[in-house]
């Protein structure tokens, strides 16, 4: 009888877990729609920035010195120190979402150190911070709350510190890593070399959307200011893209957990029915044996 009570208690426990995971799946599904929409709008804005950069590049293409004078295009300088900004979630229960990002960061650290390049880490998200703290790895900066509730202001703060160190010559390169949204059931790691920029990435294109103008400031300053906006939005896009991917991963993880709980309940019900049948059979045998002994 005690065995039956234990099984019944397990069934109740798994059923409660199933209710929780099902509720979390529904919450993640609802949040995913909002995050997906934010990521989509961010992509549109990012494409517009690229378009404007291309137009400006066409306008100033006659000034060959612009690219070489800008501090953001100095790709000939040897790389001795790299800043890695990486984004993870503030919460768990999202499958291998955070693990994939952390693995990518660790692999890049190993590759850079093998080349005698110093690495500094700027961690966005509680899970990444906890992991590297546990490993005893020094983190230059930590940001909690930006990945779970991304805003443009938070993105500005994160990227500004890294870009300032680059322009002041403290670092030679800035890399941004996050796990991005691919579709409802999959995510992909995205590694973006923020600075220095390869000049070939900005293709000069003539369009009719900009009026002819002669700016008061020099062209290098205009390009640098526009690129700063580009850096900020690259960081913001990484945050909203990561959030959409996080909800996608959590929705999938909770769906798998719900299905596993359902299967476990079936197995426990079978075990309960079998144990109950054995118990009834044992009782019947005892009754029959008792009757026989009284004859």
From Swiss-Prot:
UniProtKB keywords: ATP synthesis, Cell inner membrane, Cell membrane, CF(1), Hydrogen ion transport, Ion transport, Membrane, Transport
Entry GO MF terms: ATP binding; proton-transporting ATP synthase activity, rotational mechanism
GO cellular component, as recorded: plasma membrane; proton-transporting ATP synthase complex
Membrane topology: Peripheral membrane protein
One Pfam family this sequence matches: ATP-synt
Record's subcellular location: Cell inner membrane
GO biological process: proton motive force-driven plasma membrane ATP synthesis
Similarity annotation: Belongs to the ATPase gamma chain family.
Protein purpose: Produces ATP from ADP in the presence of a proton gradient across the membrane. The gamma chain is believed to be important in regulating ATPase activity and the flow of protons through the CF(0) complex.
Xref: HAMAP family: ATP_synth_gamma_bact
Assembly and binders: F-type ATPases have 2 components, CF(1) - the catalytic core - and CF(0) - the membrane proton channel. CF(1) has five subunits: alpha(3), beta(3), gamma(1), delta(1), epsilon(1). CF(0) has three main subunits: a, b and c.
Name under which the protein is recorded: ATP synthase gamma chain
Naturally occurring in which organism (per UniProt): Campylobacter concisus (strain 13826)
The encoding gene: atpG
